[in-house]
Amino acid sequence: TKMFEIEFPLFAFTHCRDVVVAVSKAGGFGVYAAGGLTNEQFEIDLKWIDNEIGGRPYGVDLLIPNKSLAQDEEFDSEKLKAMIPKEYGDFRADILEKHGIDGSDFRSFEQDDERGMGLAKNTKEEGSKNIVDIALSHPISLIVNALGVPPFWLLELAKEKGIKVGAMIGSSKHAIKQAEAGVDLLIASGTEAGGHTGEVSTMVLIPEIFEAIKPYGDIPILAAGGIMNGQQMAAAMAMGAGGAWCGSVWLTTIESELPLVMKEKMIEANSSQTIRSKSRTGKHSRQLVSSWTEAWEAPDALEPLPMPLQTMVTDPPLIKAFKLAEGGHEGAKELVTYWVGQGVGLLKHSISASDVVQEFKEGFIDGYERLHEFMQE
């Protein structure tokens, strides 16, 4: 709270600009995920946030991998498409057709448009620098890299502008590397988390990292992974975290960018209905189980390709499936999936993002008072 002058240390990772604004205005801290956005869309969205947020602090989350296929080469969509074996086109088309969707356009990659390539562009060195330049031209307070140690040039640029740099980590080894690199904030993401995540649970990870980084000074830790309410947040802070970083809890909010069909699937799901798989991006990421994920986990499935090629395989057919699912297509409804953590089982209704923040505050106080009562007895 001191680092960013906020009322409550609840950080909202989200692909929805409305959630960023709502959470920051409610006393938390909104973090906008650039993900696969084009430079133009990212600029438009940050301008909108600047106009709506009323001077409250916010941040951005970027995907800048330290290991990506031909990362230092200029982005060339045709060259990347040519690197994808033809059987991947047939495989994705077959999945669609088994669910009553025409897959003929997806048997080759020639017709794939730029929609599925935002992530591929942004993980190239030139694309990474472009997206960072856009972010730094706005009054952000935090920039987070979600894939490995931030490049030196990013740390230097942020420092010049007085912007804090955070990093996602999934082990104490990663925490030490980030601390040595000079990051200001660590987001310790347990395996319960949605999206790209490691194998260690949040309950184990927080105290382990808390001890591991003591020699490096007072670097705040945000707990991430499975945290869906204020009581869990209080528990994480009792273990050494300075706040909570949450993503899944915003997915079913009224403001969320997700289509209604996806929100309904999440509200109906239990905590066992997620899977950590390489099938979406080429790196392990947790998502809701669906017919699409099951097809990639089958014994006869193809091995996922490295980032960014796997995203280029999966995004175009899933974009089509989402459109059809919104129109009521039953096969498409079975296929659609989205990144979400194991805490999905705690998503029971759709409320506003500001109401989620308020519920977190109340739950945090309840959790704190419960612990205090034990000490009084």
Residue ranges and their predicted role:
Residues 77-92, 196-220, 228-377:
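Conserved active-site-proximal phosphate/metal-binding subdomains
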Residues 13, 32, 145, 223-224, ...:
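Thr-Gly-centered strand-to-loop micro-motif
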Residues 149, 227-228:
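Residue-level detector of alpha-helix initiation sites
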Residues 1-216:
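Active-site entrance/lid segments in N-terminal catalytic domains of soluble metabolic enzymes
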